Amino acid sequence: MLPLALSSYTTDWLDLLVRWLHVIAGIAWIGSSFYFIALDNHLHLPEQARDAGEGIGGEAWEIHGGGFYHVLKYKVAPPKLPEPLLWFKWEAYTTWLSGFALLIVLYYVHAGSNLVDRSVADLSSGQAVLISVGLLVGGWILYDVLCRTVGQRSELLLAVAILGIAVAAAYGSSRLFAPRAAYLQVGSMLGTMMAANVFFVIIPAHWELVRAKKAGREPEPLPGLRAKQRSVHNNYLTLPVVFTMISNHFPITYGHSRSWLILVALMVIGAWVRHFFNLRHVGVTAWWIPVTTAAGIALVAVLIRPASAPSVGVTPGKPATGSAQAGRAVFASAGCAACHTLRRAGAKGTVGPNLDAVKPSRELVVDRVTNGQGVMPSFKGKLSPQQIEEVAGYVSSVAGK
């Protein structure tokens, strides 16, 4: 799709470094989100009347790393603007930028094999990339409008509306993109909402506080209220997004015929778990939440359990002989049928690219099997050079026939 001539080795290094950066930044962002929500929920009225008179709205005592901490939160601002002032924003920005870079390296550069599955939707690489980017932008715009309209009247209705966005995105992505990419698309859309919350709402609200203090005026209350609302939303979205990040390793979810419904169920469960801890922070222990969470996960696991192992049998017909028969045997023993569709091998996997639709050349199959690509592992060392040649020859000769 994109005019980049990258070797598989170079792509692997880009994948490694960008993925590493993405995980590091994500940990920092999630950690700060969890910490500040917990801190806000643990604040209590100041014990000293002097503190209340200075505009302090809450305080908390903490112990960590061998020492005590006394945290004070002002209702509006301190008497004097402190310097330096620590901001929490680059964790979010770096997470999104590295995540989008990863989306480009793994899915947009290789859209024809990783983003598109023509057995799902007959899209060109360019169309798939444009739709993907459009969903990222459109998802944020719709969410932001809902927050500024419905969210001003009812948090419950807003929560239902946000769930509706997630359901629509999950279903739509499952009908447009390759199964594995569909989950990442939904996670990327939610992650874009979270990062945009920080960039367009939360940080501008903080700047309003700073400017108001410098100008000696009362800050506008609405930006602060919106910032708090979006911060809470980000907190609840963290675990659903983390699931989409790790989902590529579990084809039992995105490879299912009802993959979109599984995604919605597990994202709701993730947000439900987050709700348990947020309640704990205010002294409410709702043990029925982990009980219903365990029951929900068990129900999903039972409902999606395959009736039998993926078929790797041979389509009835004239039996293959010689190298073709050997290649078909390697295709079966290496587990290729669990991820790929190849009619002549009786393979109906929906996880990886549909080989009948892609019709890969022998050279391409050799490269992918030897070096891997994206989340497809390398089989170098697991298969002998002869076996790799045999399976490459077999796939290239029967794909699409």
List the model feature ranges, each with a label.
Residues 34, 49, 336-342:
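Short, thiol/selenol-centered motifs that function as redox-active sites or metal-ligating centers
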Residues 7-11, 310-332, 351, 364, ...:
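Electrostatic cytochrome c docking/interface patches
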Residues 328-332, 338-383:
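Gly/Gly-Pro-rich "capping" loops immediately C-terminal to redox-active cysteine motifs
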Residues 369, 382-401:
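C-terminal capping alpha-helices of c-type cytochrome domains
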Residues 1-314:
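Polytopic transmembrane helical bundles with strong interfacial aromatic enrichment
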